[in-house]
Amino acid sequence: DVELNYQDVKYIKNHCKFKKEYVPTLNKQGKCWYLVFPFEDKVEFQKVDIQDQVICAVDLGLNNNATCSIMQSDGTVVGRKFVNLATEKDHLYKALNRVKKAQQNGARRCPTLWKHVNDLNTDISRKTAKEIIDFAVLYNADVIVFEHLDTQGKKNGKGKQKLALWRKQEIQKLVEHK
């Protein structure tokens, strides 16, 4: 039996009046169950000439999470931002060291420790995507451009784990979705 708060129903009635409604779904996260109401809203993009476009160019890196620069169509750089989530990376590397210590003592899989590592990694990618979008909105960018990253066959040597944990495609999908 599912009950809804009055505020939730009021919010849906006020904010989702003119949006296309889909079938509600019941999702489980951990031990909690959530009722999700999906809606679709049509957004129309502005038609801007190529000469008047403002571009947000994003370079996803291993050391800095992202390097963003705002450029005009003639090539002049208007703004620049380095997204480096240092504390989150420190938490991630500390969690990886916990996994390493646990696996040194025996051939254990450590699923809870790996889940913590993966959750930290998705959190880093979400925060990076949010920083990129906020920077693009700040300068009213018309287009967000990512570099083409192909890492197949290049995972060897010292930075192999760092490259394996790099979530470049997830960041691109999150930015595209938002």
Regions found by a protein language model. Give the residues of each.
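Positively charged, helix-rich recognition surfaces that bind polyanionic ligands
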Residues: 31-178
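Charged, flexible boundary elements
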Residues: 1-53
